[in-house]
Every structure is written in structure tokens, then in C-alpha cells.
Amino acid sequence: MTDQKAVATRLAPLGFAQAPAHAHLNLPPAALVEQALRRGEGVLTDTGALMADTGAFTGRSPKDRFIVRDATTNDAVWWGDINIPFDADKFGKLHQKMVAYLAEKEIFVRDAYAGAHPATQLKLRVVTELAWHNLFCYNMFLRPETGADTSWLPDFSIICAPGFEADPAVDGTRQKNFAVIDFTRKLILIGGTGYAGEMKKGIFGVLNFLLPHQHDTLSMHCSANVGAAGDTAIFFGLSGTGKTTLSTDPNRGRIGDDEHGWLPGEGGIFNFEGGCYAKVIDLSAAKEPEIWNAIRFGSIVENTRFVPGTHTVDYANKSVTENTRTAYPIYFIPNAIEPSVAGVPKNIFFLTADAFGVLPPISRLDKSHAMYHFMSGYTAKVAGTEMGITEPQTTFSACFGQVFLPLHPTKYAEMLGHQLEANPDVTVWLINTGWTGGAYGTGHRMKLAYTRTMITAALSGVLSEVQFKTHPIFGVAVPGAVPGVPSEILDPRTTWADKAAYDQTASELAERFIKNFEKYADFASADILAGAPRVAAVPA
């Protein structure tokens, strides 16, 4: 039986005059699953996971994400299409309407943390309309120790009510769904959408503002692992670059898979989260056993469907969305490190799937190149062939997570540069998991085994003993040899039958980098700009 006084105490700072008649506080996973089943929010799979649908929205809605523009944010936030301003008074009225809506509902309240390092940890309070959303928060945020006093005043709170829809004409939203962050009130309002990832990414956005702005701590959209010797590695990469696959290593402990912070000086890195939110489209036990085995009682699978006549999930089924996901606590992974903190990274990997076949499969970056490529956040995607479009499409996402950055990308890039200066033993690598021997359509995808071998070589330190040469256009340092990898694939130009075509394609890709960077030119330092490619013909 929930202590209504304890609930009322927790809800008062969030604007609730009194607790709703049916309010649940910090229910354990089994009780939340029970509530979700009772309320018809989901069904159990044959492995015991809770399968739930997110409704009309099967992903984030970036055009409906807002930040309140006030004295706290006006001069700090990078305003534009990503960080859309919202009126403070309208936020206050929207907040009141949501509280009134939830006052008549059965609600679920949870206390949690964000950030595994005590120096920057946020105390969270989450109010959800749905039981399975509360289970999502249990899985994804950091969990207080059993018996801990969590009657705190939260550092940030979330109110999430998918059943509450805004009136755009009155409330200042674009449409009925919304996610609005108010840094002064320390509150996120989410309504009209059942996509649970809005809560996770809402707090990520909060940390991406607070940590660099107030704690001199670099926030990063990356995965991280650590070796037996305590050597930490972090992996950046957009969708399709192999970030999850390459950062998952049975010989290395998992720190986290998506969101991390890097404390100043020798402070090291830490996970923001307490769980994993992994894509499961076409999931198989053979390809990703770690994720497969984590989908059990206590886990959530979103927007999936059963094999007809069974309770077995058909992971190939895309009838709802390709963005099918699972959410589970990090301790469901056998080699998870808890607490999720580690030392200063020894190696940093920027992953790109270059479908133009231009970038080396592995190259070392100096500080300027590291900052430039960090700000560029490049990969290339192959367009669908159903319309006859086969040309690769460049994708640039600043800091490998542009849509989550409240501050200007140069802020994060300069912080990375400062960290590299303060920690000169850190090595930054650019890894091309894309094409070799030609662009998409002519060449072929780099073998995963080779990429793994190259990363293992970088982690072991063996590459410090080989000769490097400078790429004539991108300026990165290319190793002449990697143990276990054919040396002829290390220089991308030598893998092309038509050398002139390589030179032309490399120059064209370099021009796309430069064109993308034009919007940052007035803000970027000379140090960052020094990492730009040089557009020039390579001698035959």
C-alpha cells in the first residue's frame, strides 16, 4: 500500500496541491509489470519481457521539442530548428493543465538519478500516467539503493502524460504532442506521445546543457567500455556505423551504451544512465547475444509483434515501425561495470560508414582533426534502390548527436580539445566501417573482422610501433601496417582500380565537409579549422 503522505510530499514541488487518489510510489519492476498488464498497457512475451506499443509516435518528434526561453537560457542556448524557443508563461499554464489532468488519474511516481558520478549527479523525480513508462524509467535511469531516503527536493523532474493533448492555438505548441524543457523550473513536460524515449532524451538534453555550462564537464553521445588493465575507450558514431557492435566486447567491461560525461582534468568518464535502450529490428541471438539474452522479465520491448499463434517476438516484423526497441537495466548485461565510472579514456573512436570509399579504414587524428571531425559528425547512407537512387548521401550530425545539443557545437568541440590538451596520452582514431575498393556500387563493405582487428590493435597500443603517413586530402595519419590486416587495404587509394576516380571522389567528399562546416566558420577557432581537409588533386 502506497504511503499517500510520502507521495504528496514528493508531488508538492511539482505543482500538485494533493496526491491523486490512486498514486503509486517507487514500485518495483514486478509490481509495475503487474500494473501494466492489469491496465491493458502490454502483454508478456515468451521470455517474460513486457511488450508495449507507443501509439501514434514510434520515435521522437524533434519538431515538437521546445526549450523555455528566459533569463537562464536566452544567451546560452543554440536557438534554431533543433532548440525551439517556448514562452515561459505558456509553459506555466500548460503545467497547470497537466497537473489538473493527472489529478483525476492513477499515476506512478519514481525517484531516480541521472549521472553515475556523485559530483554531477542529478536527483530526478518522474511522474508517469502509464505503468510501463515508469518501468522504462526504472530501467533507464540510475536506481537509488534499497532503503535509501529519496524524499529529496529533485534537481529535475519529468511529468509524462501521453493521454494529455495540447491545444496548439492556446498552448503555444506546434500540434497536440510536445516535450518542453524549462531550466528555470527544472521541469520537463511531455504530453500527447507514448514514445518512452522522449523521457530518456529529455534528461540527456538537460545534462547536455548543465554539465558543460555549469560543471565544465563534456557531455557525449557515445558508448564506452574498459579493459582488464583499466584502459577506457569511448565510441562515437551515427546510426549504421557499427557503434553498438564494435563497442560490445566480451573481453572488456561495459560502462554504458549511449550517454556519458567526461569530467575535467583527470576526473575520468561516467555513464548518465542505468540501462540500455537498444534497437531490436532483425535482432538474433547469433548477431547480438548480449541484447538477446537481456530481453527477459523486467525488460520492455516496444512496437514489436509476435510470430502468429505464439508469444515469440518476430524481430523481423516492421509492420509498426523499423524503430523497434528494448529497454533493460544495465545489470542485465554480464560484463556491466557498476558503478558506471572509469578513468580518462585511453582511446577515442569516431566511427563512420563512408559509402564513398574514400576515408582510410583506420587513421589517427591530432587535436585539430579530432575537434573538426567531432564537430562534423560524418557518415554516409546508401539511399534505397526502389526508386533507382544509388548515390550515397552524406549525413553530418555535430558531435555525433546534433539533435540533442542545447549549446552551440563549438562549445563541445572546444571542451574535447581542452581534454586532449590536459590528457596528451589520449589517442583519437577515425574508423571507416564503410566501403573499400570503390564507392558504393563498385567497392564492397569493409569486413567486420578487419575492423575489429584494427580496433583491437589500437586498444593494445601496438600501433604506436608502426609508421604512419599523412593522407594528402584529409590530413589524417594512416598506419602502414596493422597486425592481422592486409596492408593493401589500409591506404584507400591503393584499393581503387581507377586512381583518378579516387582522387576526384576524395576531393568531392572533402568539399562536402567544407560546405557543411560553413555554418560554424564564424564560431570555430583557428585550432578547429586547422583540421579541415585540403581540397587538392593527388598526384598519380
Language-model segments: what does each one mean?
Residues T245-I255:
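A conserved segment at the C-terminal end of the G1
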Residues E165-P212:
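Charged, amphipathic alpha-helical linker segments immediately N-terminal to NTP-binding catalytic cores
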Residues M1-T150:
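N-terminal accessory targeting/assembly segments
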Residues T73-W79, D182-L187, Q393-C399:
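Gly-rich Lys/Arg/Thr-decorated short loops/hinges at beta-loop-alpha junctions or inter-strand turns
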Residues T241:
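ATP-binding Walker
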Residues I489, T494-A540:
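Generic C-terminus detector
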Residues P118-Q121, D167-A169, E198-K201, T244-T245, ...:
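Short helix/loop capping segments that flank catalytic or ligand/cofactor-binding pockets
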Residues D3-T45, A56, H221-L238, D249-P250, ...:
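Glycine-rich, often acidic-flanked micro-motifs
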